[in-house]
UniProtKB/Swiss-Prot annotation:
Residues 1-26, 103-123 are annotated as: Disordered. PROSITE patterns: RIBOSOMAL_S12. HAMAP family: Ribosomal_uS12_B. InterPro entries: NA-bd_OB-fold, Ribosomal_uS12, Ribosomal_uS12_bac. It holds the Pfam family Ribosom_S12_S23. This is Small ribosomal subunit protein uS12.
């Protein structure tokens, strides 16, 4: 324990908390360019081919972002909007691509939870 004199000289410091979405630099979303679009396998006990893109953000940081929904039209040099939100079974993937904005199309024939996947209301 510090003495009162040490506290007068130095004071106490607050512990700094780590931000989960540091690459967004405090923004809710950030624009970026796809540098690589690929599939990867999840950790045990799951099995699939998850669609992931490597994105260079306007903040200058390159991150891995998950492409949600069935089917996508992304390729290298596509402009995407990236939001926070990790994918639990993909280590190192802490961002998601927003469907239906910029070059990313919405999910076709989506009936429920449409706003999350950028799908328009069917007439």
């Amino acid at each position: 324990m510090p003495t009162i004199q040490q506290l007068v000289r130095k004071g106490r410091h607050d512990k700094s908390t780590k931000v989960a979405t540091a690459a967004l630099k405090g923004s809710p979303q950030r624009r970026g360019v796809c540098t690589r679009v690929y599939t990867t396998t999840p950790k045990k006990p799951n099995s699939a081919l998850r669609k992931v893109a490597r994105v260079r953000l306007t903040s200058g940081i390159e991150v891995s972002a998950y492409i949600p929904g069935e089917g996508h039209n992304l390729q290298e040099h596509s402009m995407v909007l990236v939001r926070g939100g990790r994918v639990r079974d993909l280590p190192g993937v802490r961002y998601k691509i927003v469907r239906g904005s910029l070059d990313t199309q919405g999910v076709k024939d989506r009936k429920q939870a449409r706003s999350r996947y950028g799908a328009k209301k069917e007439k």
